[in-house]
A protein has these predicted regions:
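Nucleotide phosphate-binding/pyrophosphate-handling subdomain across enzymes
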Residues: 1-2, 63-179
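Short hydrophobic/aromatic-enriched beta-strand-loop microsegments
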Residues: 38-43, 154-156, 179-182
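Active-site donor-binding loop signature of nucleotide-sugar glycosyltransferases
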Residues: 45, 133, 185
């Protein structure tokens, strides 16, 4: 409750506020905290992420935009991208510019594969290294979902600060990693 209050309790009045996808519990708390705010508030129920065949699309009442990307591998990040598309459309950015930009978008340190450099060059040609700076339970669920979809042995090198609830985080990866190496953070 305190975190929600800190994030939304001090937002300006008379502006535009966009609220991304939330659990019903968190969404209710956000709505209570914003009940006196005079801003225009847009919630994530004004758009949706849909899947047709093997492709994902942003969709609202006016637009359907194909999410043409090889850089985003998580439902959470796809939802974040849809949220950004909604904001861009509201800012009157043209659909064709958004479509042209989507393939270039990356979330640095989130589901990011190393594609060049000394470490990449030292790997076997069929091996890949992925980095992810996830630190919350929902991030772990998204990462675990993606890792389950790739059909190769997965090894993890993991470090997390105690104040980030590592037990809740790591339990999302049960039966996913062939081996996990834990590194202390000092």
């Amino acid at each position: 409750d305190e975190v929600i209050y800190q994030k939304v309790g001090f937002l300006s009045n008379f502006t535009r506020i966009y609220i991304g996808k939330q659990t019903p519990y968190v969404l209710n708390k956000i709505k209570k905290n914003l009940s006196q705010n005079k801003s225009i508030i847009t919630y994530a129920n004004t758009w949706k992420l849909i899947k047709k065949n093997k492709y994902y699309f942003y969709q609202d009442k006016k637009f359907q935009i194909k999410i043409n990307t090889k850089n985003i591998h998580s439902m959470g990040l796809l939802n974040n991208l849809c949220h950004a598309i909604k904001i861009a459309l509201d800012l009157k950015i043209e659909k064709k510019i958004i479509e042209k930009t989507i393939p270039k978008i990356t979330f640095e340190g989130r589901f990011q594969y190393l594609n060049k450099g000394k470490i990449k060059n030292s790997l076997h040609k069929n091996e890949k290294i992925m980095l992810d700076g996830a630190h919350a339970e929902i991030d772990a669920k998204n990462l675990a979902s993606y890792l389950k979809s790739i059909k190769v042995p997965v090894y993890g090198v993991w470090a997390m600060m105690k104040n980030k609830e590592p037990n809740l985080f790591i339990k999302q990866f049960k039966n996913i990693f062939k081996k996990v190496i834990a590194i202390p953070i000092e």
